[in-house]
């Protein structure tokens, strides 16, 4: 039997800046974008900046499956993260790896889009996990996680998943069973 659980919130955060104007993306929110941009940008063969994708799976679908596991209605579940490439991949390297980690803090999806002018800063960004006009920003804090630029997330046994690509489709089909099991056991408080 297969269940599909869709995210309740998703966004990406960007550590770079506009290559033409120099305006930073570090405080910009992309919470309402339809596309999650996961990339590393190189300028003249030098690393320029990267993005990270944030996905939240809280909600009734996940709670229902969680309860079914506790009640032993579902035994030995497997969890997969599936994301699909939306644009062409002509600039993608032939060999690369992606990692998935649970983050140590909650975050706010926000209301921004890439095309917003002026840019929207309401919600999470590379610099902040939450920000609203007229309020103090809530920065990414270290809650027993390790610093990984832009967010703090857990690492180590059971807290990471990865997928490698070698001349392969960029679609993500990653086994995240260990990460989800840690969350279900209460090891990850977020």
Each language-model region and where it sits:
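Secreted, disulfide-rich extracellular signaling modules
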Residues: 1-190
């Amino acid at each position: 039997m297969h269940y599909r659980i869709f995210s309740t919130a998703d966004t990406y955060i960007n550590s770079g800046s506009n290559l033409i104007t120099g305006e930073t993306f570090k405080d910009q929110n992309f919470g309402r974008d339809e596309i999650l941009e996961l990339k590393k940008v190189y300028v003249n063969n030098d690393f320029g900046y990267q993005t990270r994708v944030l996905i939240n799976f809280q909600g009734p679908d996940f709670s229902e499956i969680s309860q079914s596991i506790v009640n032993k209605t579902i035994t030995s579940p497997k969890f997969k993260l599936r994301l699909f490439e939306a644009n062409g991949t002509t600039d993608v390297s032939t060999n690369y790896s992606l990692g998935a980690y649970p983050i140590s803090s909650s975050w706010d999806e926000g209301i921004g889009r890439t095309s917003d002018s002026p840019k929207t800063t309401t919600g999470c960004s590379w610099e902040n996990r939450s920000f609203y006009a007229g309020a103090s920003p809530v920065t990414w804090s270290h809650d027993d996680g390790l610093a990984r630029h832009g967010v703090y997330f857990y690492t180590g046994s059971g807290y990471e998943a990865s997928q490698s690509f070698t001349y392969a489709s960029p679609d993500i089909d990653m086994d995240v069973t260990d990460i989800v099991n840690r969350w279900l056991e209460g090891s990850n408080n977020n």
